[in-house]
Amino acid sequence: VSGGGLVQAATVLAATTRIRVGVGLLPAAARNVAFAAMEIASLAQLHPHRIDIAVGHGMPSWMRSVGAWPKSPLTLLTEYITLLKSLLSGKLVHHDGRYVRIDGMRLHESAAPAAAPAVLAGVRGPKSLALSGHVADGTLLAEPVTPAYVREALRQIAPTRPHRLVAYNIAAVDDDASAALAVVRPALEVVGEMDWRPHIAPLPFHDDLVTLRSRCDGPQEFAHALPDEWVRQLAVAGTPQQARSRLADLFDAGVTSAVLTPVGTDYLVSLDSLAAVL
C-alpha cells in the first residue's frame, strides 16, 4: 500500500511556494465525500490555485481486500465526483443516491476555498473514460501513457468542454540511452498484467506483448525480456533529447500535463537528471 496522498500533498505544499501539486488518486470508496471535501477545501484554502485532485476506483485488489469494492464502481464514481465538485464550489448539496447520501450540507463559508480545485477522474477503462468526459474536469491516465493510448483515451472521453489530460510515465534520462532503458525496465513489470491491457491495446505490439507475458513465469522475467524498442515506447527514457522528443509526441497527441516518475536507487539523482529535459 502506498502512502496517503493528501498528507504527502500537504507536506509538499507547505515546503514550497510555487509548484502545483496533484493528488492521484483518492479511491472513491475509501472516503466519505463530505469529509474528503473538507480536507481538500482546507488544502485549497491554505494553498490557493496550487492543488488538483484525482478520484478513481482504486486498485480493485486493494479495495476488495478491505471490503470496499462496490457492486457498481461506475455509479459510485459518478456520484462521488459530481458531489465533490458541488461541495468544493460551496453549493448546498442534497443527494440520495445508490452509494452517496447527503442531507443538506455545504461547506461553511469560512472553510470554502476562494477557487475550487480541479477534480479529475483517474481511470483507464472505456466506460470509466466516458464517465470522466461527462462529470470530471479532466482525466488522469496512469503509466504507461503512449501517444496511441492518449488518442484512444480522448476518443472514449469525448469531452464537450475544456478537459485536462494528465499523463503519468516512468522516466529516466542519461547521456547513455541504454543506461536509461536499463533503469526504467524493472518498473515496467506490471504492464503485462490484465489491469494494464487498456494501455497496451492501441499499440502495434500488443499481441506480441501478451504472448511474451504468457511465456514468462512472472513479472520480473517479463520485464527483463521486454525488447528495448518496447521499453522506449512504454516509458520516457533515453538521452535528454530523446526524452524531450517523447514528451513532444505526448503533448501533440493531446496531453496537457506530463508527470514523470523517477526510478533508480537514488531519487534525488534521478530528479536532477530529469531536470536536463526541461
Regions found by a protein language model. Give the residues of each.
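Active-site-adjacent structural elements that line small-molecule/cofactor binding pockets in enzymes
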Residues: 1-278
